[in-house]
Amino acid sequence: GALNIFDMSYLISGTAMLGLLIYAFPEFKGFVFHKNQVILSVAVCIIIAYVLGMISWIAGKQFRCWIMKRFENKSKDDYLNSTFEDTAKHFVFKNETITKLMADSKSVAYSYMWMRLDKSQSEDCRNRFVYISRFWVLRAIYEGLILPVMFLSVTVFLRCYPVWNDLGEAFIQWIGGLCGFTIHPIFGKILVGLLFALIISIIAGIFIKLLIDEAKKCIDTQVREVIVAYYHFYEEDNTHQDIT
């Protein structure tokens, strides 16, 4: 079909981003939804969601890589190589091509394994590859939702700040009356704004950390499954090599 399993990740994160854009900018709704033109509205939604999904995934992936580099001192290649080595050391590969690739570049060896699994005509191998592909989709979904979470936190701050500001001013006046001193309104608004921003940042940070952790788990599982599947179908079971 026109869309495959990998495109679903873009549509999911893109739909979330599209919904947030409509929430943040209500006038954008008229551009997306066209009265009495259902087919056109659906087509526009799919296209916009797909594009937004790609943008969200790229931004989320780069942010995850930056976090890993900043706090774990690991690049994306370092992370892949580490998982690759931890898994591959449990097997003895005999194929000359893959052993040479593993010695030269773990990332190239991984890509080669992925390609062989993808091109296999074995039904068992194809079923396993579909299963492995789901982890790529899940990872892309988690990474693609990072940007919407950031956008949502900013939107909530801007749209809900007047409410928090009024509550904050009332609280400051109450504290001032209770303690017998007065806080200037400007400083009160700054204090409430910083407190509100801190609360939203902490909540958003928790969700983003969860998304990054789940994305990393998907990468680990995907790399392990690719190596195990390749070894089983191309090293351990020679019958599958004859039909690829």
Label for each model-derived stretch:
Residues 11-75, 175, 179:
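Long, highly hydrophobic alpha-helical transmembrane signal-anchor segments
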Residues 1-12, 119-166, 192-197:
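Transmembrane alpha-helical segments and their cytosolic interface motifs
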Residues 32-48, 155-203:
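Hydrophobic alpha-helical transmembrane segments
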Residues 1-3, 174-182, 186-190, 205-244:
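Cytosolic/matrix-facing juxtamembrane and C-terminal tails of multi-pass cellular membrane proteins
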Residues 62-130:
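Charge-rich cytosolic interhelical loops and cytosolic tails of multi-pass membrane proteins
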Residues 55-74, 160-166, 208-225:
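Juxtamembrane/interface segments at transmembrane-helix termini
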Residues 15-20, 153, 198-207:
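Hydrophobic core of alpha-helical transmembrane segments in multi-pass integral membrane proteins
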